[in-house]
């Protein structure tokens, strides 16, 4: 058995999106846009690049190095 809110909430959301939003959005949108303006993006300063060399190893391991096999649980 499905709980009542699991049925009612999607139906109410569908009614809102289908019927109420087309009527309410043109009224509410100008009011919201006055308070919630988009601010222009600001340029961030360039970060200093690191002078350390990269040898291609991640955490000290290499792709061509020795491979260890994980222990499998014996039944």
Curated annotation (Swiss-Prot):
Region (Disordered) residue ranges read 43-75
Q: Does the keyword Cytoplasm apply?
A: no
Where do the record's region annotations for Necessary for its localzation to the endoplasmic reticulum and lipid droplets lie? 1-37
Residue ranges, compositional bias (Polar residues)? 43-65
Pfam families linked: DUF4512
Per UniProt, subcellular location reads as: Endoplasmic reticulum; Lipid droplet
The UniProt entry's GO CC annotations, sorted and at most eight, read:
endoplasmic reticulum; lipid droplet
The alphabetical list of record keywords is: Endoplasmic reticulum, Lipid droplet
Q: Which family does it belong to?
A: Belongs to the UPF0729 family.
Q: Can you say what this protein is called?
A: UPF0729 protein C18orf32 homolog
Recorded source organism is Danio rerio (Zebrafish)
């Amino acid at each position: 058995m499905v709980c009542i809110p699991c049925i009612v909430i999607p139906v109410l959301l569908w009614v809102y999106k289908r019927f109420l939003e087309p009527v309410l959005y043109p009224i509410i949108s100008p009011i919201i846009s006055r308070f919630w303006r988009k601010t222009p993006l600001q340029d961030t300063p360039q970060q200093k690049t690191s002078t350390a060399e990269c040898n291609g190893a991640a955490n000290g391991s290499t792709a061509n190095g020795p491979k260890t096999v994980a222990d499998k649980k014996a039944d």
